[in-house]
Every structure is written in C-alpha cells, then in structure tokens.
C-alpha cells in the first residue's frame, strides 16, 4: 500500500502543468472575454487560468510535453518556442482575432491614457478594425473601443503619443471627430 501511495505521489509531481502569462491582443471590449474563454476551451491541453480585462493579461496552463510536438525532455523547448506555439494555436482557433504579446513594459501608473473620438463604429468588426490600428503600434500597452466610437489607448509616453495614434488612424481611414 505504501509503495502504491509513493508511486501516486511521484506521478502527481511529475505531471504538473506549466503556466505562462501574456498580454492578449483582441480584448478591445468586455464581451471579448467570453469569446476568448470559449476559444481557449477548444484548444487541446490548454486552460485559461486567469484573465484580467483591465490589463489584458491572461495566464495559461498547459502540459508542455503535449503542447510541443516532438517534445524532448533532454532538450526542453525555450520559452519563446512555447509562446510561439500557444500564439499559433490561439491565432488559428480565433481566425486571427486573438494573439499574444509580451507583458506590458512599464507599470500601469506610468502609462498615459489617450482618448480619441472617431466616427461611426456600429458593429463589432468595425470596432475591432479601429482597435487593431492602435493595438499594434509600438508603445501602445493596451487599447479599448466602445460602441459610441471612443478609442482609448494606454501608452508608454516615451515611445508614442497622441499624434502618432491619430496619424495611424487617419492612414487606416478611420474618421476622427474633433471635440
């Protein structure tokens, strides 16, 4: 009996799941949290442990031996390889509407919030398109958009500013409304 208990304990220790935390591109409005949860449920051997909409950070749990095909315990994959695999799975399952980014580079209290009012964004796809213009810019740590057409970006002021955001939106032909 003691031998069986010992084997079970050792097995439980060796079957631990790995976790990693990432920023999520695609969380531009609150209902996208539900979309992400549903998509992650479809990923084999990947669980969403925690999701913080305010920071757009998500913690994923997975068994790296199942996540990485051809896993070799003598040469475990790099953190970058695991992140790339998770990103590929998420991007494919969401048809490209969710992707991973590294965690924010500056603390929240050092970010500057910039609000930009834009023209009609009456559908989720339109809001996503306008959001993506900002979310992909260097220095944008987080962005949101609402049905009223208010885009909000939390930026690293050392890397970007309002003019750069407005310029990118204009280039993408998003109508800016003057306050």
Regions found by a protein language model. Name each.
Residues 1-3, 170:
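Residue-level signal for functionally critical sites in structured catalytic/ligand-binding pockets
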Residues 18-179:
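Flexible metal-binding regulatory segments at protein termini and peripheral loops
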Residues 1, 17-18:
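Absolute protein N-terminus
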Residues 3-13:
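Sec-dependent N-terminal signal peptides
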């Amino acid at each position: 009996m003691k031998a069986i208990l010992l084997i079970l304990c050792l097995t439980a220790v060796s079957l631990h799941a790995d976790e990693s935390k990432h920023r999520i591109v695609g969380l531009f409005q609150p209902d996208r949290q539900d979309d992400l949860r549903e998509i992650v449920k479809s990923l084999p051997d990947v669980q969403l442990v925690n999701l913080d909409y305010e920071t757009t950070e998500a913690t994923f749990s997975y068994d790296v031996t199942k996540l990485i095909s051809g896993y070799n315990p003598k040469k475990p994959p790099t953190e970058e390889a695991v992140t790339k695999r998770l990103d590929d799975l998420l991007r494919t399952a969401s048809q490209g509407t969710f992707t991973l980014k590294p965690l924010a580079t500056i603390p929240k209290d050092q970010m500057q919030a910039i609000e930009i009012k834009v023209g009609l964004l009456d559908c989720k796809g339109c809001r996503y398109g306008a959001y993506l213009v900002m979310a992909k810019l260097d220095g944008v740590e987080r962005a949101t958009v609402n049905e009223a057409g208010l885009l909000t970006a939390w930026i690293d002021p050392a890397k970007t500013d309002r003019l750069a955001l407005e310029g990118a939106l204009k280039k993408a032909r998003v109508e800016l409304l003057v306050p």
